[in-house]
Every structure is written in C-alpha cells, then in structure tokens.
Amino acid sequence: MATTNAQIYQQSQMPIPMPTPSLNPNINSAPTPGPNAMSVYEDCQSPLDTSVSGMYPGDRGSRVVSQPAPLLDQSHLRPGNQANLLSHDRTIELYRENAKKTNDPELIFEFSAFMIDAAKAMIPPEQEKDTNPSPALIKQMEKREEIIKEATSLLKRLADRGFPDAQYFLADCYANGIGTARGKQDFDRAFPLFILAAKHGHPDACYRAGTCCEHGWGCRRDSAKAVSFYKKAAVGLHPGAMYRLGTAELNGALGFPRRPKEGVKWLKRSAEHATEEFPHALHELALLHERGIENVVFVDNDYAAELLAQSAELGYAPSAFKLGECYEYGKMGCPVDPALSIHYYNISAQQDHKDACFALTAWYLVGSPGVLPQSDTEAYLWAKKAAELGLAKAQYAVGYFTETGIGIEANPQAALTWYKQAAEGGDKRAAKRLATGSRSSALDRRLEMEALKEEKRLGAANLAQRSGSGSGASGKDGKDGCLIM
C-alpha cells in the first residue's frame, strides 16, 4: 500500500543522513579459494615502502571564504588525525605479513583491494592537477604507484587462477585508469577480464560487460550481446542492469520495440533492489507516476513523492533536487515547507548539482524566518559554485552580484567576465547587459531587489504570525519576481 504524502512529510522531519560511499562499493564478496591458489605470493617482488602517512585528510579547519558553508555542518563530530589505533602504513604491513603467512587467496584479495583504496586516498584531487609538484608530493606519488603496482600484481595472479572477484576488481581498475599507462582508461585490458568474471556469473561483471558491448569500449558495439549480458546480470538481481533493460524497453533502444509495459516491469524490479550506486529506477518511476502512461502507469503523486524520498535517502541528487522544489512550491501534493526544501536542496547541492546550488542562492537571498538566516555572502558563494559548474543563469547572477556588490566587493570589470560566460551559455539578460554597457540600470535593479527582499521578509513574518508557526511560511514566496533568478 502506497505511503501518503502526509506520512512522507512526517517521516521527513527526521534528517536524512548524507550518503558516504564505501571505499570499495563494487565488491560483493571475497572469492572462494581454489585448489591451485596456495602460491599467489610466489615470485612477488620484495616488499615496497608503502608508508601512507597523511593518506586521509584530517579535520577541516575554518571554512575558506571562497566556498559556501554546508547547511548541516557536523565537522565537530569528526575524529582527529590521531584517531586511528594503527597508522595506515603499519596496517598495510600487518596485512602483508598475514597474507604471506597464510597465503589465503581471500585474504590476499582483501589486501589488494585495501591497497588500491589506500592509494586512491593518498593524494587529494586538487593536488593531482598540480603542474609544479613539490618534492614531497612527487615522493608521495611515487609511493602511490608502488602500492598500485604491488596490488595489481597480486590481483593478476588471483585472476589467472580463476577468482572472479579479482578478475572484476582488476578490470574495474583498468577501466578507471588505475595501474595503467599515464593513468588512462584501458578498456582493451578491462573488457576481457569483465568477460572472464561474467562467465563465472559475477553480476557486476555481467553488467559492465554489457555497457562495454553497448558503447564499444574495448570491443565493437553489439546491442544483442549487450542485452544478453544485461539479462544475465538481471538474473543476479543487478539493479543497474534491470534499469537499463527497462529504459531500453520504454524507449525502443538496444534493438527492442517500444514496449512501455515491459519497461515498467523492469524498472519496478530494479527499484526493489535499488542501492546508493543504482537508485535511478526509483527516480524514473516517480517521474512516470507524476505524468502517467495511458493504460500502463496511472498518475499517483503520493506514490511518486514516496519514490523520490526513497531515492533521495540513497543520495540521488536529481531526486533530492526535485523534492526540494516540491516542498518549496507545494508540488505533487507536498506541503510548502522551507526547512524540508532547503534540506533536500542541500543534499543535492553537496553533490554539485548546479540547479540545487542556485536554488540555495535564492533561499539565502531572502532567508526563511526560523529556518535560514538571510545572507548575501552565502547567496553569492552558492551562485558562484553553480556558475563554476556551468549554469548560465548562475553566471549571470554572479556577474550581477559582482557588479553591484552583493555578497562581495563590487568589481565591474570582473562582472563583465561573468556576463560574457553567461551570454556564451545562452543567457539573454547577460547578452543584453553587455549590449547596453550601462551600469546605472544594474544599480536600479539592485535597489528594486532589496525592496523585494524586504517585502518578502515582512510578508513571511506576517503569515507566520497569523498561522502561529514560523515553519509553515516560505520567505521565498514570489521568487519568480526576483530579477536575477
């Protein structure tokens, strides 16, 4: 029986935790030892220096002003750098000693996977792009390569002995540029390993082999083979494979005729087994129940909202963004609730969903009594984040903020750069602003916007006073009248 919007609304008062991806989300289980698996460590090269001190970042310090503040900041709950009982280099050494001592293939596989995950975390992404690395960073990079080399060497030996999890994990490494020349994706090496693991019935490998056949990664494109692998993965209840079969049936892709009824069946099966990695079917079913398909899917906003909530709980940014809109504007039968709207927008924005970032800009411009304090600085920072993600209307907004001094010191020259980016992205207001070249109109618009913000704050406060509750009124009512949104 479908949950009502009222029930969803009550349940949603509990905060939804931000999803934390596991270090190794693709491995379901360790391989079963085989009869010839006792010499995996034979002929391995001598142990390497695998000290990985500083592998994990410690506590965040004070927030850099160039980044928007997280709305639900729980950084004070994080452990410090000394929270680990053992240093990571010591952990790797103990792992290695145990693996050598027992020569247990399962333990060796776990050790290899641990080393790969450790290597991934050794260097922050921003330092990866450093064109002039320091000697310390160069040493850390060399150490990381040594760890990856040892791990992939062990995985190769396990894969050669027929361990499907090792075959899949190594293929996944190659597909993501780990253990390859210059860190480039190597599907020519990955695809055969996906095939080997798929022959053992490995669901993830079947799915990945299907994607390779569909897109021609490491092989020629072959829709029939792709469907065959997807169906084999679906037998293993792989949600991604079931979702792809569903969308193919819905849209008439991969050689299927357009069969909405069959497509919906696959989507429902996928939704029943949705995970953080594959929540897509929940979102797609929600959209279908929002608009309906004649004689196939009936319109049911309550059920659609329930599906979106389930998907958002799994951390799917598009679902969280859509729920943010629903609770902002009262769509799909959801009550207007600024707190829930901001909450869901935040979940989405933390995953770099550009429209969600810009939605938070709008909320910060006007604030919400008892929920979110008004802040021009935060409005600017969220707009800047959305602009950097390529949203044209956010680029225009940043130009406007920069020109008129909202949340940042006024700088007309810097504003022109943002206007140009917005115009190139198709924003007509930016093109018009560049054509007129007049700053007076922008200043007039700022005065008008300040008056609009004050009007909204007063209106929201009056409504809250009449209703006896500060959470039932949106300080963002009439946002469409805002001159920059």
Swiss-Prot record:
What does the record say about the knockout? Increases cellular chitin level and decreases cellular chitosan level. Swollen cell with abnormal cytokinesis. Melanization of surrounding media. Irregular capsular width. Sensitive to: high temperature, Congo Red (cell wall stressor), caspofungin (cell wall stressor), sodium dodecyl sulfate (cell wall stressor), Calcofluor White (cell wall stressor), caffeine, NaCl (osmotic stressor).
Q: Name one Pfam family in it.
A: Sel1
Q: Does the keyword field hold Transmembrane helix?
A: no
One Gene Ontology term of the biological-process aspect is: chitin biosynthetic process
> What Gene3D superfamilies does the record point to?
Tetratricopeptide repeat domain
The record's subcellular locations are: Cell membrane
| Propeptide span(s) | 483-485
Q: Which PANTHER family match?
A: CHITIN SYNTHASE REGULATOR SKT5-RELATED, PROTEIN SKT5-RELATED
> Which family is annotated?
Belongs to the SKT5 family.
Under which name does UniProt file this protein?
Chitin synthase regulator 2
Native source organism of the sequence: Cryptococcus neoformans var. grubii serotype A (strain H99 / ATCC 208821 / CBS 10515 / FGSC 9487) (Filobasidiella neoformans var. grubii)
Q: What is the lineage of its organism?
A: Eukaryota, Fungi, Dikarya, Basidiomycota, Agaricomycotina
Gene designation:
CSR2
